[in-house]
From Swiss-Prot:
Residues 1-28 form the signal peptide. GO terms for biological process: cellular response to glucose stimulus; cellular response to insulin stimulus; import across plasma membrane; inorganic cation transmembrane transport; intracellular monoatomic cation homeostasis; intracellular zinc ion homeostasis; iron import into cell; iron ion transmembrane transport. This is Metal cation symporter ZIP14. A motif (HHHGHXHX-motif) lies at residues 249-256. One of its GO terms (molecular function) is monoatomic anion:monoatomic cation symporter activity.
Length: 490
C-alpha cells in the first residue's frame, strides 16, 4: 500500500487533465470554433492559387515562384546526359516534365498531393537559394564551354576561310565592267548589312548583357527593332522612286539645272565610293590594250581621291601598271592607309570570333558567318582601291592577304581574353562595331551602287536586290538564334 501512495497524485493529475481537455473541446464545439484538419491546408492552397478544386499550370507556377522553387535555368529542350543530382535547382519546366504535366493539364487535389514532395525536397535541399544558384550557374557555364582543342580548331578554320576571301578580288577584275557584277556586288553588300546588323541585335549585344535567347525571350523584340529599320528603309525607297518618276514626267530628260550638276568637290569626294564599288570606267585607261599590241601609250593623268593625288606610275612604260611590279616608294599613301585600317578592322573581327568560340562553338560559327558575309564585298572594294592607288596585281593580292591575316592575331587575343576574363565586354565592342560598319559604312556604299544602276536603267531591279540581300541576312541570323538551343556542334 505504501508503494502505491506516490502514484495516486500523478494518476489524479492525469485524470484532471483529460477532463479539462474534453471540456475545452466541448466548449469549442458549443461556441462554433472550427477544428483543424489535414484537408483544410490543401483546400486553402487550392482556393488561394486556383479556381475551385483545381490548378492550371500557370497557377501552379505562381505558387512555385512564391516559394522560390523551380527558378533554375535548366532547359528541357537540351536533356542532360546521365543522372541529374537532385540537390540542384530545377526549372519549373523540368519539374512539370517529371510529373508529365503539360500546358493543358488540370491539377486536382490528388495530382497536387503527388507534387508536394517535389516542392518539399527542393525547399529542404535549399538548392534554389541565391548562393547555390550562383555557384550552379558558374559550374554549368564551365561545363557547357567547348574544349581548348575545339576553340582553336574551329577558330582557325573559320578565320582561314574568311582570309581566303581576300584572294577572290583578282578573280573578278575581268568582270568589273559587266552589269551583273554591279548587281551581284549590290546583293552581297545588302547581305552584309543584314547579317551584321542582325548579328548585333540578336546575339552580340544580348550576349553582352548576359541574355539567353532560350530563356529571356528577347528575340521577338530584337526582330521588331530590325522591323523598324526596314520599315523606314522601304518607305524611303518607295517615296524616292515615286518622286523621281514625277519629276521625270514634268521636266523630261533633256535638260539639267545647275542644282542637278555635281560640284567639283562632290566629284572628288565621290571617287573613293566609286573605287570601292568597282567603278573603274574613269580610272582604267581605255588605251590599255595598246600596251598589249606593242604600242607605247603616253599617259599624263592623275587619280584624285579626296585630298590625295596619285600619279599614274611608270607612264612611259605601261598604262596598266598593276600588271607589273611597282616600287613601294611610288605607291600612293591611300594604299597604305587602306592596308593599315583594314588590318585593324580584321584584328577586331578576329577578337570577336575568338571570344565567341570561348562561349560556344555555335556562337563562334554564327559570328563567323556574319563576318564572312561582310568581308566578301569589303575585300573586293579594298582590292580595287589598292590597284588604282599604284599597286601591281601581285602587290595588291599580297597586302590584301597580309591585312586579312591580322584576323589570326585578333583570334588569339580573343580566345585568351575570353578564357581568362569575361567575354561580355568583347561582345559589346563587337556589337557596336557591327552596327557602325553596317549602317554608317556599308549602307551608303549600297546606296551608291544602286544609284549607278538606277541611272542606267530602272530603279526597281536594284530595289528588289537590296530587299533580297537585307531580308536574307536577317533571316539567316534569326533562324540561327531561334534554333540555337537545338543545334549541337562539336
Amino acid at each position: 500500500m505504501e508503494l502505491l501512495r506516490p502514484a495516486l497524485p500523478s494518476y489524479f493529475l492525469l485524470t484532471l487533465l483529460s477532463i479539462w481537455t474534453a471540456a475545452s473541446e466541448a466548449r469549442a464545439v458549443s461556441t462554433g470554433m472550427p477544428t483543424i484538419s489535414a484537408a483544410s491546408f490543401l483546400q486553402n492552397l487550392m482556393h488561394r492559387y486556383g479556381e475551385g478544386d483545381s490548378l492550371t499550370l500557370q497557377q501552379l507556377k505562381a505558387l512555385l515562384n512564391h516559394l522560390d522553387v523551380g527558378v533554375g535555368r535548366g532547359n528541357i529542350s537540351q536533356p542532360v546526359q546521365g543522372p541529374r543530382n537532385l540537390s540542384t535547382c530545377f526549372s519549373s519546366g523540368e519539374l512539370f516534365a517529371a510529373h508529365n504535366l503539360s500546358h493543358q493539364s488540370q491539377i486536382g487535389e490528388r495530382e497536387f498531393q503527388e507534387f508536394c514532395p517535389t516542392i518539399l525536397q527542393q525547399l529542404d535541399s535549399r538548392a534554389c537559394s541565391s548562393e547555390n544558384q550562383e555557384n550552379e550557374e558558374n559550374e554549368q557555364t564551365e561545363e557547357g564551354r567547348p574544349s581548348s582543342v575545339e576553340v582553336w580548331g574551329y577558330g582557325l578554320l573559320c578565320v582561314t576561310v574568311i582570309s581566303l576571301c581576300s584572294l577572290l578580288g583578282a578573280s573578278v577584275v575581268p568582270f568589273m565592267k559587266k552589269t551583273f557584277y554591279k548587281r551581284l556586288l549590290l546583293y552581297f553588300i545588302a547581305l552584309a548589312i543584314g547579317t551584321l546588323y542582325s548579328n548585333a541585335l540578336f546575339q552580340l549585344i544580348p550576349e553582352a548583357f548576359g541574355f539567353n535567347p532560350m530563356e529571356d525571350y528577347y528575340v521577338s523584340k530584337s526582330a521588331v527593332v530590325f522591323g523598324g529599320f526596314y520599315l523606314f528603309f522601304f518607305t524611303e525607297k518607295i517615296l524616292k522612286m515615286l518622286l523621281k518618276q514625277k519629276n521625270e514626267h514634268h521636266h523630261g530628260h533633256s535638260h539639267y539645272t545647275s542644282e542637278t550638276l555635281p560640284s567639283q568637290k562632290d566629284q572628288e569626294e565621290g571617287v573613293t565610293e566609286k573605287l570601292q564599288n568597282g567603278d573603274l570606267d574613269h580610272m582604267i585607261p581605255q588605251h590599255c590594250s595598246g600596251e598589249l599590241d606593242g604600242k607605247t601609250p603616253v599617259v599624263d593623268e592623275k587619280v584624285i581621291v579626296g585630298s590625295l593625288s596619285v600619279q599614274d606610275l611608270q607612264a612611259s612604260q605601261s598604262a596598266c601598271h598593276w600588271l607589273k611590279g611597282v616600287r613601294y616608294s611610288d605607291i600612293g599613301t591611300l594604299a597604305w592607309m587602306i592596308t593599315l585600317s583594314d588590318g585593324l578592322h580584321n584584328f577586331i573581327d578576329g577578337l570577336a570570333i575568338g571570344a565567341s568560340f570561348t562561349v560556344s562553338v555555335f556562337q563562334g560559327i554564327s559570328t563567323s558567318v556574319a563576318i564572312l558575309c561582310e568581308e566578301f564585298p569589303h575585300e573586293l572594294g579594298d582590292f580595287v582601291i589598292l590597284l588604282n592607288a599604284g599597286m601591281s596585281l601581285q602587290q595588291a593580292l599580297f597586302f590584301n592577304f597580309l591585312s586579312a591575316c591580322c584576323c589570326y592575331v585578333g583570334l588569339g587575343f580573343g580566345i585568351l581574353a575570353g578564357s581568362h576574363f569575361s567575354a561580355n565586354w568583347i561582345f559589346a565592342l563587337a556589337g557596336g562595331m557591327f552596327l557602325y560598319i553596317s549602317l554608317a559604312d556599308m549602307f551608303p556604299e549600297m546606296n551608291e551602287v544602286s544609284q549607278e544602276d538606277e541611272r542606267k536603267g530602272s530603279a526597281l531591279i536594284p530595289f528588289v536586290i537590296q530587299n533580297l540581300g537585307l531580308l536574307t541576312g536577317f533571316g539567316i541570323m534569326l533562324v540561327l538564334t531561334m534554333y540555337s538551343g537545338h543545334i549541337q556542334i562539336g
